[in-house]
């Protein structure tokens, strides 16, 4: 199993604002979120092969999640709505998470994290058919 642990810095981002728009985030909040998310600090701690802590810090907000592969947990969608999430291994180097809103209606959301052979961490976030890709390297 790969080790996702480390402090990660972003090197590339595609479609982040488009994904926020698909989630219904208004233009003013999108501009703030895009600026804040341009340099997130991401810390991942992995215990054994299946227990994770992920902290993402920006100038606007910090999120922390703790989860075990295969066990449902509560978190928030990227636009802050409460949801139930379930993470599974899709391959040896890639975890995928399906999210289910706790209240209300909204686009179907999910995320995945994959370690590449050259050491990059690829975060993919989806809102219905809009896909955002963010690429990180270890600091």
From Swiss-Prot:
Cited InterPro entries: Calycin, Fatty_acid-bd, ILBP, Lipocln_cytosolic_FA-bd_dom
Source organism superkingdom: Eukaryota
SUPFAM superfamilies: Lipocalins
Pfam families linked: Lipocalin
Key words, A-Z: Cytoplasm, Endoplasmic reticulum, Isopeptide bond, Nucleus, Retinol-binding, Transport, Ubl conjugation, Vitamin A
One GO CC term on file: nucleus
Record text on subunit structure and interactions: Interacts with importin alpha, RXR and RARA.
PANTHER family: FATTY ACID BINDING PROTEIN
Functional summary from the UniProt entry: Transports retinoic acid to the nucleus. Regulates the access of retinoic acid to the nuclear retinoic acid receptors.
Domain notes: Forms a beta-barrel structure that accommodates hydrophobic ligands in its interior.
The protein's name: Cellular retinoic acid-binding protein 2
Source organism of the structure: Rattus norvegicus (Rat)
Classification of source organism: Eukaryota, Metazoa, Chordata, Craniata, Vertebrata
This protein's encoding gene: Crabp2
């Amino acid at each position: 199993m790969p080790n996702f642990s480390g402090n990660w810095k972003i090197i590339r981002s595609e479609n982040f604002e488009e994904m926020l728009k698909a989630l219904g985030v208004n233009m003013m909040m999108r501009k703030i979120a895009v600026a804040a998310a341009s340099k997130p600090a991401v810390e991942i701690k992995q215990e054994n092969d299946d227990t994770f802590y992920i902290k993402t810090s920006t100038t606007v907000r910090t999120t922390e999640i703790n989860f075990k592969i295969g066990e449902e947990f509560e978190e928030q969608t990227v636009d802050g709505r409460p949801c139930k999430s379930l993470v599974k291994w899709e391959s040896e180097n890639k975890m995928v998470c399906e999210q289910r809103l706790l209240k209300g209606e909204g686009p179907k959301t999910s995320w995945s994290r994959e370690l590449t052979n050259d050491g990059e961490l690829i975060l993919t976030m989806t809102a219905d058919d809009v896909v955002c890709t963010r690429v990180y390297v270890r600091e």
